[in-house]
């Protein structure tokens, strides 16, 4: 089972403050573990334009029609001072890894320098931090009913309002997560 380019959808019983009602986009999953970005936990009072200002990035060819007031996500509890940019191709940036045909993750400054210009990728999600699981840890959490899984959907990843992503991700597999009981059992 490889969950790269899938969503992890927190079950209602998962009460960890970081992962409660979260949707995690899995960027890498292999025999050594998994790495992902939470895509529905906005950081308070931090938007893309604030990140660019803090890093003193002011593109010369700024296009005022491109909005930079999108929220920056808390990508996870690890390396919260490090930026991760999920975006649609191209992957021409210095530190890009293609996750799927339609999704790339970049950690280099050059992608930030394109934001707000005609050169930026068409869809962008900026996060600080990431989540990871050691070998076998995610599989055990799945057996413990901590998560649902669904193939990733770019509309949910990039276009669905943040507050609706948890519910919409569960709908991908036919579940209305708001009607689920808080504790799951084993059959």
From Swiss-Prot:
It comes from the Bacteria. GO terms for cellular component: cytosol. It holds the Pfam family DUF179. Belongs to the UPF0301 (AlgH) family. This is UPF0301 protein YqgE. The gene is yqgE.
